[in-house]
A protein has these predicted regions:
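Short, small-residue-biased leader/transition segments that mark boundaries at the very start
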Residues: 2-7
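Catalytic alpha/beta core domains of metabolic enzymes, predominantly
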Residues: 70, 185-284
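Active-site mouth loops of central-metabolism enzymes
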Residues: 79-97, 120-125, 145-149, 169-170, ...
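Catalytic beta/alpha-barrel core
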Residues: 127, 143-155, 164-175, 188-199, ...
């Protein structure tokens, strides 16, 4: 109708084709939109206002689970992503040794920090571009897609060229200029939840990335700050079913940063899979006692191997494929 054509010119329209129906989402100022103008069309089943400020991320706009492809590894939709590796890239020998070990255990992606955002300016800041080349060498050696953190837009072009899954850390979850820049790449984005972020704030950060043109977003729960100081953070297991209710995006869990202690990783990883997580990102180091970063929360390769064997039954029980 003329009215609907007029609205179309004022609003941004997104079409999502599901298995049973097609959803047309109108994004913009919809306050003055009269649903009755659309309900008279026999091909329209119903018209509804989405109350939440995030639209593209919202399950109401996209009922089917999104499956993100990371260089051939599926995340979401019944696939369990297993991401593992050292907190920091320290040397080529170290990374390749760990990469081979975690792959043998069943991991399907390799993590490693080349650029490290540290609370203290005196802590190890990472090897930078040299570390990125080491990760690429490990991928060449093992075939594992690589996951590493982008801290600044100035490196986006090289990350777009070399990195399979670009991680945005908790500190940058609300760095909106950086999030908007991520629309320039079609590389998948792993968006970690900020340590003080509400669910809505987390969803809105994902919305920034998607609204800028990149639909390939994976959410990551890594623990939030509470009054408790015994653990590094508090893992919000509720976030897994909450996110699955609010959004169609896959959600993975980082039990290493959540607890900050290696012996907490095992039970929290198992609990995360049981709660419906689409993946785990776990720090593994062949010599945690000499690690340059976060050795206390890293598993040794043999412990990681045991963990994955024990997770298999849990994953099967909740319909996840390892």
């Amino acid at each position: 109708s003329a009215a609907s054509e007029g609205y179309k010119r004022q609003l941004e329209v997104h079409t999502v084709k599901g298995e049973d129906l097609t959803i047309i989402g109108c994004i913009g100022d919809t306050v003055r939109v009269d649903p009755k103008l659309f309900e008279v069309d026999s091909s329209v089943e119903k018209v509804m206002h989405v109350q939440e400020p995030y639209k593209l991320v919202n399950r109401a706009f996209h009922p089917d689970d999104t499956v993100v492809d990371v260089s051939g590894v599926k995340v979401g939709g019944g696939h369990l992503a297993l991401i593992a590796g050292p907190c920091s890239v320290e040397s080529e020998e170290q990374v390749i040794e760990i990469a081979k070990a975690v792959k043998a255990s069943g991991a399907n992606m390799l993590r490693g920090g080349a650029f490290k955002p540290r609370t203290s300016p005196y802590s190890f800041q990472g090897l930078g571009l040299e570390g990125l080349e080491i990760l690429c060498a490990a991928r060449e050696e093992t075939g594992l897609p690589i996951v590493t953190e982008l801290m600044s837009p100035e490196y986006l072009e090289i990350f777009d060229e070399k990195v399979d899954l670009i991680q945005i850390g908790a500190r940058n979850m609300q760095n909106y200029d950086l999030l908007k820049q991520l629309g320039q790449t079609k590389r998948p984005i792993l968006l970690k939840r900020g340590l003080n972020a509400t669910y809505e704030e987390w969803m809105m950060s994902a919305e920034y990335i998607m609204a800028s043109g990149n639909p390939n977003v994976i959410l990551c729960e890594r623990g939030i700050r509470t009054f408790e100081t015994y653990t590094r953070n508090t893992l919000d297991l509720q976030s897994i079913p909450v996110v699955r209710k609010l959004s169609h995006l896959p959600v993975v869990v980082d039990p290493s940063h959540a607890g900050g202690k290696w012996w907490l990783v095992d039970p929290m990883a198992k609990a995360s899979v049981a709660a419906g997580a689409d993946g785990l990102i776990i720090e593994v180091h062949n010599s945690p006692e000499t690690a340059l970063c976060d050795g206390a929360q890293s598993l040794k390769p043999e412990k990681y191997d045991t963990l994955l064997k024990e997770i298999t039954g849990i994953a099967k029980a909740v319909g996840k494929e390892m």
